[in-house]
A protein has these predicted regions:
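Surface-exposed, glycine-biased beta-strand/turn segments
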Residues: 1-103, 108-115, 136-138, 143-147, ...
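Extracytoplasmic
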Residues: 44-46, 58, 64, 102, ...
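Active-site loop architecture of trypsin-fold serine endopeptidases
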Residues: 151-162, 166, 255-258
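Beta-strand/loop nucleic-acid-binding surfaces
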Residues: 122-132
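Active-site rim elements
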Residues: 48, 239, 787-795, 848
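Glycine-rich, acidic and aromatic/proline-enriched surface loops and short helix-turn segments
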Residues: 69, 74-75, 104-114, 621, ...
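Cell-wall glycan-active module
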Residues: 1-36, 42, 115-116, 166-744, ...
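A structural motif
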Residues: 754-784
Length: 886
């Protein structure tokens, strides 16, 4: 999903917020437009925004997301001359303090926020002075950031709009995973994950002063004794004793599996004893030479010493907890520009403290490889999500007591930290996509009387909680009941009204306004004509004549004032007209705080298929993509490509999954990635390096002098363009080039016949050579070196995409670490720095190994960055044309 604010020039447009601008008009505090309640504690389904730029240069109102026109109405022209009193009274758009514009646009948005999670919602832009197109009709397409009109007047104040986001119950449920109550499922959604991760840790979980997963201890291996047989220490028996694996002991001591057979006998002395008859007898290993590193023991095993050890002796190899969690804690993992912050809250959402992991996001690949060597890919997901979402299962060698440990340092309060296993028994993992209640997300849906006065006890309890002794809201008595002695009921009504007054005052304050922005409220639209009396006749009440308990201050409008308000409302209303135009939303529906909605959904990094297809420009320079009609762009992302290259099906799903896994969480990161792969793949046409058997063999395996001469004679211009010639004449090239290919083959690990073609460049970013395939396979605990597995990197969309994400996250860049050329692991380090040409160049180097196609990569990036991010306008290039749906 791509979404942006209706104004782009400021990070978040300003709401007209001055407390002293309160005026009555249709249940709103005019100029303020507070959500979800305003004047008289009446419902108000949106907010009022001020267009940046002032009167001199106000920014146009823009569509917040791709969508289609449901209804558009130009505003009644504002009279140029100052009206007389009679003219003001006669014109319904002059009300209270001045003119109010009645131009309006309603957009319907259909998008995706996860795999198979399609949602529909509506955005409403009221009080426009003009609309962008007077001839708009229902169904016309509008794209995100397109100007849709200009802000108008609200009661005499210029450059303002009323802005709403609404949806029906079914789509609220698709959007949030539920449509009522708190988040109580045992696990967050797996097909809709984005934003921050939240892990609920139960009470009673062990706390450690150090990370027990990475702690090691010294162990002196017992000297080999040929008379004791099987009781000698073996690599396997030591691993069993310390509840680990031989592979982990080898890794801790810097040895490989291939070295185990020679290393272990030398450690125990078995080798030295066997060589006792040799001419030069090797010395028996000392205690120091028999000392190895073993993992520290923790958990249940720490309390269960082997039969031959006492608990006191066993303790030297264990890590004991320093305490246990005393209550349920919620740990949030939040990443920004490579840094990870772990925020601890209690179940009510109150913040306890936080711990920072500087560059933890950039270094996540290394952490996964070091911590979960059996299957780093599964560990990588555990570190990022607090659970494993993809197909890669954790290796048995990485498990502890049947579970994959996930130790992180967390804050218990402002001054105390400890390590805790965030994947211990009883933990639950969620994401922002689950809209957890501890962040404040609250459903308000108990006001069912259909009027525009807030009669919600849910909302009142949230703003002004009832004291334990306070009676519930009464049904106010009639005159006969008063005569019979209903003084106590009247007193209860007075108390309730006092509570309303306190709640009304609190609702105007910044802290409570922030809290209320997380409410999702079912209320009637304020823009319907035919039910005005039902929604507003309570304004005519007279003090002393059976007042309604939930009226804050009786207004007691007379007939003339009430009719004038009604005429004003009729001039602004549009709901029935929109229904005639095709609007299918019920008058009573769910309202989001629109700015909170946009802010929350901007964290959604899942892109719909339509949004992805737009990233392939309809026209670009010939060496970039050339002409690409909408149908071709759509097919390359969905059905793949089989002409002039091969692109597997369902790349729209595979890339979204990969982006989620490898932290492509911002439009900037995604734009940099697509710019690179579009050039690497020929504008998304191929996932494999082109070339016949001879080309691939002589590039990556072996080149004979005769073949080198043929290349010099027949492909000299190409050799020069690729940088292979380097000014050499024919004899020199023929003499030197075969050796260069031999060295390249050795560096790539291409040591078997046919390895050149077998391990050609494959994937959205090419992995090349046996070693490249092997290391990627070790990351995922999958064999990609045995035929036919190598081809999966190009014919399986999930592997083609995942291998590119792996390349990006694992790439180590060596540079001066200044400006755009940041050094270290993970290309995100450079992608996060900016959107200039120099940034694209800095990313091209680790992806391409040079600067081939740099101009096209920069061209792609500028266009894609416009599509995905909040850039106002298309790049100024005659070669580029925006992709739109036919």
């Amino acid at each position: 999903m791509l979404i942006s604010f209706p104004f782009l020039r400021t990070p978040e447009p300003r709401t007209d917020d001055a407390l002293n601008q309160g005026t009555f008009g249709l249940g709103e505090r005019t100029g303020k437009g507070a959500f979800p309640v305003s004047h008289q504690f009446g419902w108000h389904g949106g907010v009022h925004l001020v267009a940046p730029g002032g009167d001199a240069n106000p920014e146009p109102v823009r569509a917040i997301a791709d969508g289609e026109i449901v209804y558009a109405r130009p505003s009644t022209p504002k009279p140029k001359a100052t009206p007389t009193g009679e003219e003001r009274d006669a014109n319904p758009l002059y009300y209270y303090a001045g003119w109010t514009s009645n131009g309006v646009v309603i957009l319907k948005h259909r998008t995706e926020i996860g795999e198979g999670v399609e949602v529909v919602f509506y955005s409403i832009y009221q009080h426009l002075s003009t609309v962008a197109k007077a001839d708009w009709k229902s169904g016309d397409k509008v794209y995100r950031k397109d100007p849709i009109g200009k802000a108008g007047d609200i009661y005499g104040k210029s450059n303002r709009i009323h802005f709403e986001i609404v949806a029906d119950k079914a789509n609220v449920e698709r959007l949030m995973g539920r449509s009522e109550g708190k988040l109580e499922v045992a696990e967050g959604r797996r097909n809709c994950v984005w934003g921050d991760m939240h892990i609920v840790v139960p009470a009673g979980v062990p706390l450690y002063a150090v990370n027990p997963r990475t702690e090691t201890r010294k162990y002196v291996v017992r000297a080999f004794n040929s008379t004791v047989g099987v009781t000698n220490d073996t690599l396997e028996s030591v691993a069993q004793r310390f509840h680990t694996t031989p592979a982990r002991i080898l890794a801790l001591n810097g040895k490989t599996a291939a070295q185990a057979g020679t290393w272990w006998p030398k450690v125990t002395g078995a080798y030295q004893i066997a060589m006792a008859s040799a001419t030069k007898r090797p010395p028996v290993p000392t205690d120091a030479q028999r000392t190895i590193r073993v993992p520290a023991v923790y958990g249940a095993a720490a309390a269960m010493p082997p039969d031959d050890l006492t608990a006191e002796v066993w303790a030297q190899w264990t890590v004991q907890p320093i305490g246990r969690t005393r209550e349920v804690l919620i740990v949030t993992l939040s990443e920004a520009r490579g840094d990870i912050t772990l925020i601890t809250r209690d179940v009510a959402g109150e913040r306890r403290g936080n711990v920072s992991e500087p560059q933890g996001g950039y270094n996540l690949y290394k952490t996964a490889v070091d911590t979960y060597p059996g299957c780093p890919s599964a560990g990588y997901e555990m570190l990022r999500f607090g659970r494993i979402l993809g197909p890669d299962a954790p290796a048995a060698t990485d498990l502890h007591e049947g579970r994959l440990p996930h130790f992180r340092k967390i804050a218990l309060d402002g001054s105390t930290t400890a390590f805790v296993d965030l994947n211990c028994a009883g933990t639950k993992a969620y994401s922002d996509a689950d809209f957890p209640h501890w962040q404040g997300w609250t459903f308000i849906d108990d006001d069912t009387d259909g009027n525009s006065r807030c009669d919600s006890m849910q909302l009142l309890d949230l703003i002004e909680p009832r004291s334990p002794t306070q009676p519930p809201v009464p049904d106010l008595p009639g005159s006969s009941e008063v005569a019979q002695g209903a003084a106590t009921v009247i007193d209860a009504a007075t108390q309730h009204r006092g509570r309303l007054i306190r709640a009304y005052a609190k609702a105007q304050r910044g802290e409570m306004r922030e809290r209320l922005s997380y409410c999702v409220v079912k209320m009637p639209s304020e823009w319907a004509r035919d039910d005005f009396d039902k929604r507003w006749d309570w304004l005519k009440g007279v003090e002393g004549q059976s007042p309604v308990a939930n009226i804050l201050f009786p207004i007691c409008l007379g007939d003339a004032a009430y009719e004038r308000l009604k005429r004003h409302h009729q001039a602004l209303a549009f709901w029935e007209d929109a229904v005639e135009n095709g609007l299918t939303l019920d008058k009573e529906h769910y309202h989001f705080h629109p700015m909170r909605f946009v802010d929350a959904l901007k964290c959604c990094s899942w892109r719909s298929t339509r949004e992805l297809a737009q990233t392939l420009p309809r026209r670009s320079s010939q060496n970039a993509g050339g002409a690409i009609p909408w149908s071709v762009a759509w097919d390359r992302w969905t059905r793949g490509n089989s002409g002039d290259g091969f692109m597997p099906q369902n790349m729209h799903i595979a890339i979204n999954r990969m982006w989620l896994k490898y932290g492509f969480i911002t439009p900037l990161r995604q734009a940099h990635f697509l710019a690179q792969i579009y050039k690497e793949s020929g504008a998304f046409k191929s996932t494999a390096e082109k070339g016949d058997e001879r080309y691939l063999r002589t590039m990556y395996e072996a080149l004979t002098p005769i073949e080198a001469g043929e290349d010099y004679d027949n492909k000299r211009a190409w050799l020069q363009a690729m940088g292979f010639l380097r000014g050499r004449d024919r004899p020199t090239y023929v003499l030197q080039r075969p050796g260069e290919i031999r060295e390249k083959a050795q560096s790539l690990g291409n040591v078997q016949l046919g390895d050149g073609p077998r391990f050609r460049g494959r994937g959205l970013i090419h992995l090349t050579g046996r070693n490249g395939y092997k290391i990627y396979g070790e990351f995922r605990n999958v064999d990609y070196t045995t035929d036919p597995s190598p081809s999966r990197l190009s014919i399986d969309s999930s592997v083609a995409a995942d291998s590119a994400g792996y390349f990006w996250a694992s790439k180590v860049m060596v540079s001066p670490n200044a400006g755009a050329l940041r050094s270290g692991m993970n290309i995100h380090r450079r992608a996060d720095l900016g959107a200039a040409d120099i940034n694209v160049s800095a990313i091209t180097t680790p992806v391409n190994g040079g600067s081939t196609g740099l101009q096209e990569r920069q061209e792609f990036f500028k266009y894609i960055h416009f599509i995905l991010d909040d850039v106002e306008s298309m790049p100024l290039s005659s070669a580029l044309k925006r992709q739109v749906e036919d």
